Amino acid sequence: MKVRASVKKICRNCKVIKRNGVVRVICSEPKHKQRQG
């Protein structure tokens, strides 16, 4: 899980979602998981 000011899709499997007011990237590749903070 990377915590970043700006979250971006890294590959085509990445999805940007908003969960409890937090922007997250979920992906089948665990390295691509990010959240905004």
From Swiss-Prot:
Keyword line: Ribonucleoprotein, Ribosomal protein
Transmembrane annotation, as ranges: none
GO CC annotations, alphabetized: cytoplasm; ribonucleoprotein complex; ribosome
UniProt keyword Transferase, yes or no: no
Lineage of producing organism: Bacteria, Pseudomonadati, Pseudomonadota, Gammaproteobacteria, Vibrionales
Gene Ontology biological-process annotations: translation
PROSITE patterns in alphabetical order: RIBOSOMAL_L36 (PS00828)
Protein name, as recorded: Large ribosomal subunit protein bL36A
Pfam families in alphabetical order: Ribosomal_L36 (PF00444)
InterPro entries (UniProt xref): Ribosomal_bL36, Ribosomal_bL36_sp
PANTHER family from the UniProt entry: 50S RIBOSOMAL PROTEIN L36, CHLOROPLASTIC (PTHR42888), LARGE RIBOSOMAL SUBUNIT PROTEIN BL36C (PTHR42888:SF1)
Disulfide pairings: none
Family to which the UniProt record says this protein belongs: Belongs to the bacterial ribosomal protein bL36 family.
Alphabetized GO MF terms: structural constituent of ribosome
Residues in coiled coil: none
Domain of life: Bacteria
